[in-house]
């Protein structure tokens, strides 16, 4: 009987909401012997509202791979129409999200210009405000409950921000908060 962690280590299948984000090494010296223990680091997507992946120039490519893996897994595990993704990338020429460029704009958007970023965040803030008002006026406690009660279900929105604060002006930073 194979556990979840065994299947991950064997590079087999794993839940779409669990994504490996890197490896961590621990080095010890015990009785004159140098020992290195390496462990994989995972993030559970379903239990996080915000995830920050910091990188430097040496790790930028790996960080982009992690972001693409996270977005790809979220999209693959969602039914059509239940997830919208926006990639805010003022330096879009770095090819971070090329793999997703073929998707319909209603599913995946790439925003690079400061005015487009501000407009998108303004629209999302107003839209979220309307949903919250509906939640407060109704007997539902969460977006999940809201979607269960509605015929036209509200999709989940994921906003990926690359190279923050590049491309953001003071108004878009305020909207993001």
PLM ranges: what are they?
Residues 1-24:
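Coiled-coil termination/hinge junctions
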Residues 19-177:
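P-loop NTPase catalytic phosphate-binding loop
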């Amino acid at each position: 009987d194979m556990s979840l962690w065994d299947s991950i280590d064997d590079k087999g299948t794993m839940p779409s909401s669990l994504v490996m984000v890197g490896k961590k090494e621990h080095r010890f010296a015990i009785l004159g012997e140098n020992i290195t223990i390496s462990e994989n680091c995972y993030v559970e997507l379903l239990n996080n509202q915000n995830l920050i992946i910091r990188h430097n120039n040496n790790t930028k490519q790996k960080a982009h791979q992690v972001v693409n893996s996270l977005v790809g897994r979220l999209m693959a595990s969602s039914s059509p129409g239940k997830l919208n993704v926006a990639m805010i990338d003022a330096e879009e020429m770095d090819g971070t999200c090329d793999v997703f460029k073929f998707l319909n704009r209603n599913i995946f958007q790439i925003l690079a210009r400061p005015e487009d970023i501000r407009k998108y965040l303004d629209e999302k803030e107003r839209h979220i405000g309307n949903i919250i008002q509906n939640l407060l006026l109704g007997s539902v406690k969460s977006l999940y409950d809201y979607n269960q009660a509605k015929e036209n279900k509200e999709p989940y929105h994921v906003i990926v921000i690359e190279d923050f604060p590049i491309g953001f002006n003071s108004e878009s930073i305020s909207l993001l908060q």
